[in-house]
UniProtKB/Swiss-Prot annotation:
This is Spaetzle-processing enzyme. The lineage of its organism: Eukaryota, Metazoa, Ecdysozoa, Arthropoda, Hexapoda. Glycans are attached at residues 140, 311. Induction: Up-regulated in response to fungal and Gram-positive bacterial infections. In the active form, heterodimer of a light chain and a heavy chain; disulfide-linked. The active site is at 181 (charge relay system), 249 (charge relay system), 346 (charge relay system). Endopeptidase which plays a key role in innate immunity by cleaving Tl ligand spz and thereby activating the Toll pathway in response to fungal and Gram-positive bacterial infections. Acts downstream of pathogen recognition receptors PGRP-SA and GNBP1 and protease grass in response to Gram-positive bacterial infection. Acts downstream of protease psh in response to fungal infection. Proteolytically cleaved in response to Gram-negative bacterial or fungal infection; processing is likely to result in its activation. Cleavage produces a light chain containing the CLIP domain and a catalytic heavy chain which remain covalently associated through an interchain disulfide bond. It comes from Drosophila melanogaster. Gene3D superfamilies: 3.30.1640.30, Trypsin-like serine proteases (2.40.10.10). The gene is SPE.
Length: 400
């Protein structure tokens, strides 16, 4: 049996022993050395689980998501056989800021998450982690993958017809990052469609709530999806919808109200520090969405693909035949036969996992801009707006 499975089995055995508040012994105040917590950059202490409310409360949650199970198992740092009771013996790596008295077992969004203002970007202790125009040749995601993915919902003028035409990524409690052409384009003008709302926490557009059956036969359902009306769209001032180059193809969508984070609704991280200037050449990245499949029909289920980033010079050589001139604010990825972003995935994130504080954190390296028609042509990568080139612009546009 794998170490992770053994650890979780041990933690599972104590669930039935937890009822209401966990009683702490004097030994629970002892630290067994420093450690690196699973979901925090700060240093942690190896302590009794009863001294770590964050993990003690999580232990009492049923049913647990796969990510919660993994977090619990990987957080265990030992056993203290000097004390009585299986619960009291478990040692976990707890971030210093999360130690203290045990709180109520009912899980609720943290105060920090619930009250975060629109001009505040979350740290990588909150954003970019998993509790998995255009996806072509993709595979299904799991129910919990990419919780920052959103659908942009459009309403036709003088009609009650709604459609999902673009994707995007949640940046914080109030803003979504998407492509400029998702807010201004000839196609939108012709169709008479206007951006109306944003859907969060979606996986399968045919069902609400979304449910999945695990290998052990247990059926788990996510909360119902959330539709929030748009307060305003902010298109980059230098974006020209009719330009063949499609530079500055980036936009922000401000929601009418703040959204609280959950396992199924969570922001992705913006590039920071050295990632801002990184062009990510030869990196493998993930793209996800509900766009057209190889059958040229929108996918009901969120799909994902893995693409490799091209050298910009090589990409320019491909697109020069279309008189396209790429610059450093753009990047290219993909080009594998039958694997591409496609109609409906525009505005979605190009995601790169970076090991941070002992876990993978997803950053939004790019925003889906455009590609070839038909999608998925061998040797033709898709073009993305490079997010790192617009960090200052994004921060300037955020409001409380």
């Amino acid at each position: 049996m794998a170490s992770t499975e053994r650890n979780f089995l041990l933690l599972s055995l104590v669930v039935s022993a937890l009822s209401g508040l966990v009683h702490r012994s004097d030994a629970a105040e002892i630290s067994f050395g420093s450690c690196t917590p699973q979901q925090s950059d700060e240093r942690g202490q190896c302590v009794h689980i009863t001294s770590c409310p964050y993990l003690a409360n999580l232990l009492m949650v049923e049913p647990k998501t796969p990510a919660q199970r993994i977090l619990l198992s990987k957080s265990q740092c030992g056993l203290d056989n000097r004390v009585e009771g299986l619960v009291n013996r478990i040692l976990v790596c707890c971030p210093q800021s999360m130690r203290g008295n045990i709180m109520d077992s009912e899980p609720t969004p943290s105060t920090r998450d619930a009250l975060q203002q629109g001009d505040v970007l979350p740290g990588n202790d909150v954003c970019g982690f998993l509790f998995a125009d255009r996806i072509f040749g993709g595979t299904n995601t799991t129910l919990w993958e990419f919780p920052w993915m959103v659908l942009l919902q459009y309403k036709k003028l003088f009609s009650e017809t709604y459609t999902f035409n673009c994707g995007g990524a949640l940046l914080n409690s109030r803003y979504v990052l998407t492509a400029g052409h998702c807010l201004a384009s000839r196609e939108l003008d012709k169709s008479g469609a206007v951006l109306h709302s944003v859907r969060l926490g979606e996986w399968d557009t045919r069902t609400d709530p979304d449910c999945t059956t695990q290998m052990n036969g247990q059926r788990i359902c996510a909360p119902k999806h959330i539709d929030i009306e748009v307060e305003k769209g902010i298109i980059h001032e230098m974006y020209a919808p009719n330009s063949v180059d499609q530079r500055n193809d980036i936009a922000l969508v401000r929601l009418k109200r703040i959204v609280s984070y959950t396992d199924y609704v969570r922001p992705i991280c913006l590039p920071t520090d050295g990632l801002v200037q990184n062009n990510f050449v030869d990196y493998g990245m993930d793209v996800a969405g509900w766009g057209l499949t190889e059958n040229m029909q929108p996918s009901a289920i969120k799909l994902k693909i893995t693409v490799n980033v091209w050298n910009l010079t090589s990409c320019q050589e491909k697109y020069s035949s279309f008189k396209v001139k790429l610059d450093d604010s753009q990047m290219c990825a993909g080009g594998q036969l039958g694997v591409d972003t496609c109609g409906g995935d525009s505005g979605g994130p190009l995601m790169v996992p970076i090991s941070t504080g002992g876990r993978d954190v997803f950053y939004i390296a790019g925003v889906t801009s455009y590609g070839t028609k038909p999608c998925g042509l061998k040797g033709w990568p898709g073009v993305y707006t490079r997010t790192g080139a617009f960090i200052d612009w994004i921060k300037q546009k955020l409001e409380p």
